[in-house]
C-alpha cells in the first residue's frame, strides 16, 4: 500500500497494524519525523519516503493507494470553530488543484484491480464528492466501489447515495459529535 500524504501517520499506523506493507510518502521532513516517531511508539513498521507525492516515481505499482489529501479541514469545525475564518477562496482553489494532482498521481501508481482511496476531513463537496465525480467522468478505467454500512460499524447514515463515506459533525451527537470526513473507494478496472 502506498500512503502518499502520510504524515503524521495515523492511517499509516492503522494499515501497518492490519498487516499491510506500507510505503509512507510525505513531502515534509518535520512531519515525516513525527510519522517515524509515531510508528516507533506503536512498534509498527513502514517504509518512509520524503518526497512530493505528485513527483514521486516508485519502481513498482501498488495494490492500493491511500490519499488522505490536504484540504480545508472544515470537518474539524466542532473542535476548531475558527476554521471558517482562517481559509480563503484562494486557499480552497489551491487545495482543489493539489487534490486533483494527487488523484491523478494515485491512479498512475495502481496495478489493474488496485484500489484508490481518497479522503479529506472537509465538509465541502468540492473537496470530496465533486472531485470524485470529475475523476470518474474523465477516467473511465476506474469505478466506484461502494462502502457498506457493515464496514463502518453499521452506521448507514455515514454512507451517501453514491456509496461514499460522508460523515458530518452532528453525527453521533449523543457521544459529543464527530469530525466531518469524506472517503471514496475506487477500483482500477
Residue ranges and their predicted role:
Residues 1-189:
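S-adenosylmethionine
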Amino acid at each position: 500500500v502506498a500512503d502518499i500524504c502520510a504524515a503524521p501517520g495515523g492511517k499509516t499506523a492503522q494499515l501497518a497494524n492490519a498487516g499491510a506493507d506500507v510505503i509512507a510518502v510525505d513531502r515534509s521532513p518535520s512531519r515525516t519525523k513525527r510519522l517515524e516517531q509515531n510508528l516507533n511508539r506503536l512498534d509498527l513498521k513502514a517504509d518512509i519516503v520524503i518526497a512530493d507525492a505528485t513527483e514521486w516515481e516508485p519502481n513498482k505499482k501498488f495494490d492500493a493507494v491511500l490519499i488522505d489529501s490536504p484540504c480545508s479541514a472544515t470537518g474539524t469545525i466542532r473542535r476548531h470553530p475558527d476554521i471558517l475564518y482562517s481559509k480563503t477562496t484562494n486557499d480552497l482553489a489551491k487545495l482543489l488543484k493539489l487534490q486533483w494532482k494527487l488523484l491523478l498521481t494515485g491512479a498512475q501508481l495502481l496495478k489493474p484491480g488496485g484500489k484508490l482511496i481518497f479522503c479529506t476531513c472537509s465538509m465541502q463537496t468540492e473537496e470530496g464528492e465533486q472531485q470524485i465525480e470529475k475523476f470518474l467522468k474523465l477516467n473511465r478505467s476506474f469505478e466506484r466501489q461502494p462502502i457498506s454500512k457493515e464496514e463502518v460499524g453499521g452506521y448507514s447514515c455515514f454512507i451517501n447515495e453514491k456509496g461514499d463515506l460522508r460523515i458530518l459533525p452532528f453525527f453521533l451527537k449523543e457521544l459529543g459529535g464527530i469530525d466531518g470526513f469524506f472517503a471514496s473507494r475506487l477500483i482500477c478496472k
